[in-house]
Amino acid sequence: MSTLLIDLKGKELEQEEVELLSHPLVAGLILFTRNFEDREQIQELIRSVRQRVKKPLLITVDQEGGRVQRFRDGFTMLPSMQAFQETLSATEQVSFAKEAGWQMAAEMIALDIDLSFAPVLDLGHECRAIGDRSFSSDVKSAVNLAINFIDGMHQAGMASTGKHFPGHGHVLADSHLETPYDDRAKDEIFGYDLQPFQQLISQNKLDAIMPAHVIYGQCDSQPASGSEYWLKEILRKKLNFQGTIFSDDLGMKGAGVMGNFVERSKKALNAGCDLLLLCNEREGVIQVLDNLKLTENEPHFMARQARLKNLFKRSVIEWNDLVLDQRWKLNHRNLADIQSRWLDIQAAKND
């Protein structure tokens, strides 16, 4: 049973990485800025992975836009999600959100990447880890922009991943560095933070969801990423979500309360995650591969494997054809202009 997504150390594929990626438990990999030099190099790296690993691998990246954009030189400068609301009219916002989703997905698919983990559905901009990655603090605006962004992704042929369930926007701590605690009342979380996820699930817009490494103290004692309450009771049963559940990176400090890497993996799977990310922890990956025992007799084996298949890219796009496309050319200029205006607004605030 394939369940783990791992990372690569550098810009070239190492033999050890071929062996790790070939392990039956490994479902795919996630790419980072450290793997990127330029477009030709990253395409060659991906081609090498596809050729040397003799099984289908889900290749992923965080190419959200704004400050979370792993590939920059030679690619469209995608706006931060907050930039749409801050720089555009109401009509322009939804139009350009859709174009940003399409542009991002088309460029990644042209590299032979299956999935970019997007969009962020957290509300508000106060959390250090989220900030301008959030569309808005207003539920209606965030949902409207997210729908259009996802429609653009789907049009290009990429699945969507809503994150970070049930909402990371109202904790100041960064789960990359520590485990955040959100002690707000359950009614507030359900009536506000959860709404983008609930509404997008009801409209069948989300192919996957990534829960937060946040403990919501009035609801459960475990981080959402390792919580049966959040993933089985709320996400699967109450919201009737049928797509894939990714863990956020189990190498993050925010996941540390769940134990060592093997324990974190087991807890996330038992809580309801289908696929696990473990990054920047090569020894941790090896520990998990050596000690996590999953078989085809697992109760959710068939459902999990079916969900994995639904995440692979649904189109073939050639880079040389893409850059001749008038839609791409127009977006390439307009989206960069939106981000430039947003950066100017931020700079003026800081003066």
UniProtKB/Swiss-Prot annotation:
An annotated Gene Ontology molecular function: beta-N-acetylhexosaminidase activity
Gene3D superfamilies found in the cross-reference section: Glycoside hydrolase, family 3, N-terminal domain
UniProt cross-references to Pfam families, sorted A to Z: Glyco_hydro_3
GO cellular component: cytoplasm
Catalytic activity entry: Hydrolysis of terminal non-reducing N-acetyl-D-hexosamine residues in N-acetyl-beta-D-hexosaminides
Keyword flag Ribonucleoprotein: no
Keyword Cell division among UniProt keywords: yes
EC numbers: 3.2.1.52
Active site annotation, chain numbering: H176 (proton donor/acceptor), D248 (nucleophile)
Function: Plays a role in peptidoglycan recycling by cleaving the terminal beta-1,4-linked N-acetylglucosamine (GlcNAc) from peptide-linked peptidoglycan fragments, giving rise to free GlcNAc, anhydro-N-acetylmuramic acid and anhydro-N-acetylmuramic acid-linked peptides.
Family designation: Belongs to the glycosyl hydrolase 3 family. NagZ subfamily.
Protein name: Beta-hexosaminidase
Protein source organism: Haemophilus influenzae (strain 86-028NP)
